Every structure is written in C-alpha cells, then in structure tokens.
Amino acid sequence: MSKKKDQVLLNEQIDAPEVRCVGDDGTQYGIVSRDEALKIAEQKGLDLVLIAPNANPPVCKIMDYGKFKYQQEKKLKEAKKKQTKIEVKEIKLSVKIAQNDIDYKVKHAREFLEKGKHVKFRVFLRGREMAHPEAGVEVLEKIIPLIEDIGVVEKKPHLEGRYVNMLVIPKKEEKKK
C-alpha cells in the first residue's frame, strides 16, 4: 500500500518558484515567491502547505500542519462511524428436516430480522439429494410464509454448488408521524 495519496508537500519540499499564498484565517497574500511565503509562515510559527499543486501557480496555505492532519483523520473516523455494516446470519437446514425443527429455526431467524440483521437460509444437499435440488427449494418455500410479516425475500431459493440458498432481509419500518 503506497502513501502517495496521503503525501502533502510542505515548507522546503515545495519546489515551485511562485505560489498563490492564503493565510490560515483566509487572508489572501496573492502570488508571491516561495521564499517569501516561507518567511510569512515562519513569522507566524506555522507551516506552508501545498493545497492545489496542479493550479497555475500552485496554491499554498499557511496553517498548523499537525492540527490540519488531526482534523482530516477525525473526519475519516467520523465517516467510518456513519457507515452501517450489514451482518448476515446463516441458518443451515437439510432436505429431511421436520416441521418442528423448521419452526425452531424460523424463530431464530425472526429474532435476527428483528435486530435488523440479514438471514441466509442454506439447505445442504447430501449425496443423491443433488439429483433433486427442488426438494431443497421446497423446504425454503415452506419458510417464506412464516417470515413474510417481518422479512422480505431478497434472493429467491436458488442452487449454488451443493447448497440451495435464500436471502431474507428485514422489512423497512414505516416512520410513525
């Protein structure tokens, strides 16, 4: 992983002879030589940071680089917090499952859906059961009416390798006014 995108040129690293200089308080210094911009930054006890290297002339800002970097990291952390991670719970079944076992597994699936988690039902096909994958589809179709009130079937029962899979997601709650 390269750090090229995170690399910011500051102070003596800036090689442009002239730069458009902006102060940390928004003060416009105009187009000045790099050395003059460095002097202004040094007088204020701050850093000269290259903001727009592709502009003509390049734009530099006089600021506290440590503080700037801290605020950038803080923004990234805040953005990560706002992302929601979807958790998928998997419930395994077999073709020869009894109705009371289906009810038990559906009870757990309902609990997961109430917590906002996605549920993946998998029917494992053993040996000769692979010749009749529709038996696995039938098992999953028995489950659909038992969870319709709380979940939505996102992916209908379909064969994937030795499994017949079905994905159920929680229903969106209508906002009460």
Curated annotation (Swiss-Prot):
Any GO BP: ribosome disassembly
Key words of the record: Cytoplasm, Initiation factor, Protein biosynthesis
Location relative to the cell: Cytoplasm
GO molecular function: ribosome binding; translation initiation factor activity
Lineage top rank: taxon: Bacteria
Pfam families xref list: IF3_C, IF3_N
PROSITE patterns cross-referenced by the UniProt entry: IF3
Any one GO CC term of the record: membrane
Task performed by this protein: IF-3 binds to the 30S ribosomal subunit and shifts the equilibrium between 70S ribosomes and their 50S and 30S subunits in favor of the free subunits, thus enhancing the availability of 30S subunits on which protein synthesis initiation begins.
Similarity section: Belongs to the IF-3 family.
PANTHER family membership: TRANSLATION INITIATION FACTOR IF-3 (PTHR10938), TRANSLATION INITIATION FACTOR IF-3, MITOCHONDRIAL (PTHR10938:SF0)
Subunit and interaction comment: Monomer.
Protein name: Translation initiation factor IF-3
Native species: Nitratiruptor sp. (strain SB155-2)
